[in-house]
């Protein structure tokens, strides 16, 4: 209740202890500030349901700069709404900080979010291919590859896209997992595992309860702001 549109959410690799949740990654290419705040709320509740020991997740708004004056009108209005909310909003975050754990939940519209996701996927694929080519270039490089094999296997495992298969269609009264059509059986198994974890954590009921509480707090803040603006308008007239 209170969610206008569902969003595609996905956990991304991070150098921090926990993964980073990003949404929307393509379901809604054009969003209002209110809808982006809704995404922040449902992302916040999902993260808390899956990582209760983490506490209040840090919410970041994906933008072209960290300053609050940066971005489109929609993004700047969203910034103001998130700042006045009871969420743990840490401000704007640039795309180069997404994989460094600067925020636990990253919010964007589906247009920007999908471009970010595809850029990350492309960069990982490019770097993997470039490393492979360099190690196969000559005999010396091949010998170096043998020595570096344990580290390379660890890196490959950490960045394996199949491990992150299974995007969540968040904001519905049910568990919906969207799998990548080009993945293999291992990728599908991770998507099924994601569905299992969501069902086991009872995330739906927790999200519904949390969303209701956050919306009630947000409406109270809006009412207070409207009253203050009305009072200021009256004082200006006098």
Residue ranges, per PLM feature:
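Structured loop/turn residues at beta-strand edges in well-structured enzyme cores
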Residues: 101
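Glycine-rich phosphate/nucleotide-binding loop
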Residues: 1-18, 105-106, 110-220, 224-227
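Glycine-rich beta-alpha junction loops
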Residues: 27-29, 60-68, 94-98, 109-113, ...
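Long, low-complexity, intrinsically disordered segments
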Residues: 231-238
